[in-house]
Amino acid sequence: MGMDVISVIRTKRDRGELSGEQIDWVIDAYTRGEVADEQMSSLAMAILLNGMNRGEIARWTAAMIASGERMEFSSLSRPTADKHSTGGVGDKITLPLAPLVAACGAAVPQLSGRGLGHTGGTLDKLESIPGWRALLSNEEMLNVLDTTGAVICAAGDGLAPADKKLYALRDVTGTVEAIPLIASSIMSKKIAEGTGSLVLDVKVGSGAFMKTIEDARELASTMVGLGTDHGVKTVALLTDMATPLGLTAGNALEVRESVEVLAGGGPSDVVELTLALAREMLAAAGLPDADPAKALADGSAMDVWRRMIAAQGGDPDAALPTSKEQHVVKAASSGVLTRLDAYDVGVAAWRLGAGRARKEDPVQAAAGVELHAKPGDTVTAGQPLLTLHTDTPDRFEYALAAIDGSYDVAPTGTDFTASPVVLERIA
């Protein structure tokens, strides 16, 4: 029997359940260009409004995986472990985490993305290192992984091509927030990537795509279920993104902070989350006795970082770019900093040039925001709260508009408890 896209759209519009055949057909036809963008956006909106059950999401994910190639890491002598973050502000965790987990005995094939909107992209950050290359052939990627234990690079065009098309479409049709589509997008890529185990860092709060713990929990549970159904050992941590992670949001700024963490220093929240995710990855990969804190302290994680950067053409000793212009934002009053909004800081970093509005936009390596205080810290009137960095000073005005109203200072003595970094674990 022939399929037609109108009947598929109507099924979901009328709150029906899509059959496996309908799902397989529509994903394949859309990938081949037989189903038009406007028809797929109509179906995506119906899914956003009416949802999908677990069976539909599993079949949709399987169809996206089947649209392209699957990677194979069975030739490696080490177990593979991977991490995916749903994105946040100052989220540089992949940079110290991949070499740290590799230093403890797992192989970490980290296929990463670029930034879009207020959240930064791992590849943009690493490209601020002179000479470093994000684009590797499958052969080069396996070679780096085999020799250093970790690789961070761009996903090839062959992995889940259906997702690439649908991802770009969701971005411009107001359907980014559909939990079934977020879950299948992330998991189709990760399962096609061939990893044996996966740890999900699902961000919650103003700087995340999931604003509430309930939505984050639903997304995490859906993804853990999908991973398990496809034979990938999957665990999720729900983590706080009400305020930026660490003390920097940008590209070179975050690389510098990541290197500090690998050198045994760095902000406590970045260290805490890096270690929490490392322990989960190592346990999922069958290495529960490995001690990531020791690998940070003894320099072995830093050693893997240096070798990984060099293997991808980068110079680990090169000076990172610094911005031509800075603007300091000072505290207007003395007291306790009780709020510093992650979303607003992310928008400011983006407006300074650290991010892009369209996929083809360039980014400034040195642009971003540096924090001089975090919620819970005591501040004095006139002390620096934030430093804005850019190469184009006419951007300051737009960035300052985002920062305006982004923080609260309460009277000295106000009782304030910072949110924990890790909120929940879902397995």
Where in this protein do the model-derived segments appear?
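Short beta-strand segments
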Residues: L111, L145, C153-G156, D201-G205, ...
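Short acidic, glycine/serine/threonine-rich loops at helix termini
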Residues: T94, S112, T119-D124, A155-G156, ...
